[in-house]
Each structure stands twice: as C-alpha cells, then as structure tokens.
Amino acid sequence: MSRSFFIDESGQDQRASPYEVLAGLAVEDRRIWPLIRQLSDAQQHFFGMRLFEAYGREAKAQKLLNRKTFRLAGQMAAIAHADRTRLAHELLLDGSKVTRERLTALGQAKIAYCRFALRLARSHGAVVFATIVPRTAPRPTKASALRKDYAYLFERFYYYLNGLPEQPMGYLVFDELDRSACHILLEQVSNYFVRTANGRTRARLIIPEPFFVHSDLTTLVQLADIVAYTISWGVRLRTMTEPSRAELADLAGDVMALQFNRRLDSGERQSGFKVINDLRPAG
C-alpha cells in the first residue's frame, strides 16, 4: 500500500510565529477516505456543520487555536457537549448573535475538535514529520536551490518508507500556492530528485513530482496545518529556546505522540522532527 504525505506550513511570515514549520502527515492510502469521512463527521459533531460551510474557506489553525480561542473557552466552566454544539452552531450560522455563552462554546468546540482530530489520525496509523526553523535562520538566495527544510523533510519521508516491510511508494501533496510559487517549488523539487545523489536515491520510494491541492477542499492538508501550528507555538524540542504557549501543552502532547520514531538494529534512532538553523544548501 502506498503512502500519501500531506504537507503544509506555519510561520512563513517570519513575524509573529516563533518558528517556521514545514509539516507532513503520512497516511496509508486505504486509510485516507475513512479518516476524511470521520473528520467530516467530527466537525458536524462539534460544530453542528462543516467548517467550510461556516467560513467559506479553510479553517486555519491560526483561527482555531489562537490565544483568543483559549481566552474565550476559559471564561466559563466547561459546557455540556449537546449545549456546546448548539451554541457554537448558532454563532457560526449568524455571527451577529454574539453572547458570552456562545463565544465560550465555540472556543471550547474548536479546541476539542483539534484534539479529537489529532487522536483520530493516530488511530488510523498516521504519523507526522516536521522541519522546524528559527526566524533568524539564514536563507538561500538562489531560486533554483531547494531549501534544507524541504530536503530534510524528504529525507525523513524516505527513512519512514524504507523501513516499512513492503517499502511502499510515497506521494507528495502540497497546499497550492499562487501559480508562480508552485512552478518555482516544482523546479526546486525536480532539481533535488534529479540532480543530487541523495535525491536520486530517495526517488526510488518518493514520486518526485508533487500534487498541489486547494487546502480548503482537502481535509488532511488542513490537519497538517494544525500539526505545523501546534509545533511552532507549543512543541519544544531540546534545542528550541523560544517560549511556548502553555495552553497548547495538551495539543503538543498529541502531536508528539504522532511523531515518526524508529530504533534501528544498530541502535540508531530515526525521528520525524528536525530543527534546522541554516536553510542554505550545503556547499
């Protein structure tokens, strides 16, 4: 069975976010549709409707998990599920019907949904990968050069696929950028897989030409966005010195539980997360 890697990013503005994160969610092909269906049902369960119906576009993690969400969620005691769903649904249907209770219910529903989505992904055997870049990291100047965060992410994908018994093929699924940015990324990815020794090796298991999709129509790219945002603001590996948001601790734990980890017979440990302090290609 093949694996699809749904990829999204967080913190690319290099302003407010403490880290720039490129995250990938790997799902076995036969698990994709059941996971999507259950996530759709979960949105109905927590909000009384699909989030796309509510917002008319992708519900980004920045909207679901920002500080305001947690502040509003905590301004009252936990609301019983049925009442919480009803109140959240009422506010999503008509944003002018603002009450303290509805705002609280919507905040609590957003957090509960994100936690449920991450745990659901794990129950379907999904694993996550991420490259984590400080805002101050030097960046490449040549447009044709693939940044290190992409190269390291592909490396982690390859390790994962190569260690599976059937050595399945992997497909790259990116959130669609503007057309010119897509062409630039396609060229960079092609150069990596065709012109570098590591890339040619990894092309044995990773299809070198990625697919681009609209994230507001692709549920699992949205889930990768939740992973990327949570890592940027909530996960802290040993070398990550920026402060985290304490209210994201539970979600950070859910993301860490999804991280790819493998111990080789040699004792070497392979992991899905990598902190990169310099994005310029080697040499």
PLM regions: where:
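Phosphate-ester processing/binding pockets and catalytic centers
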Residues: 1-283
